[in-house]
Amino acid sequence: MLVLIQRVSQAAVHVDDEAVGQIGPGLLALVGMEPGDTEAQLRRMAERLLGYRVFADEAGKMNRSLRDTGGGLLLVSQFTLAADTRSGMRPSFTTAAPPEEAERGFNRFVEICRENHAPGVETGRFGAHMVVSLVNDGPVTFLLRP
């Protein structure tokens, strides 16, 4: 499992010209599931995601987390994130979880995040062609692994 997070002023995801998820200030998280991701890894990633300090404190240092700020969280599944890009000129997706396994894992990850982040968690639509828009704040971008 890997999650690419971006600190945003706002973000939204549309499917067929319909907004299916949107947030104000917070984090956009692109989520790539890998074969064999476990419940423990999902829980660890949720803890890291909600506790990762990427927001400024009073002194301007990145010392506050999403949990501290109460910001929004937009989770978007993205199997291409788990691609093997080590060789050649075309990505291989053998390192990404198969669709059914990935959907189960992503949905469980969303549940865990919702249980632990009362201010709200929005999502895209698994497996759909999505148009993601965001206003990057910083930019501040990190790749997290459990």
Curated annotation (Swiss-Prot):
Q: Which Pfam families match?
A: Tyr_Deacylase
Can you tell me where the transmembrane regions are?
none
Does the record carry Repeat as a key word? no
Q: Which GO terms describe its cellular component?
A: cytoplasm
User: Mostly located where?
Assistant: cytoplasm
Q: Name one GO molecular function term.
A: tRNA binding
What this protein is reported to do is described as: An aminoacyl-tRNA editing enzyme that deacylates mischarged D-aminoacyl-tRNAs. Also deacylates mischarged glycyl-tRNA(Ala), protecting cells against glycine mischarging by AlaRS. Acts via tRNA-based rather than protein-based catalysis; rejects L-amino acids rather than detecting D-amino acids in the active site. By recycling D-aminoacyl-tRNA to D-amino acids and free tRNA molecules, this enzyme counteracts the toxicity associated with the formation of D-aminoacyl-tRNA entities in vivo and helps enforce protein L-homochirality.
What is this protein's name? D-aminoacyl-tRNA deacylase
Q: Origin organism of this chain?
A: Stenotrophomonas maltophilia (strain K279a)
Underlying gene? dtd
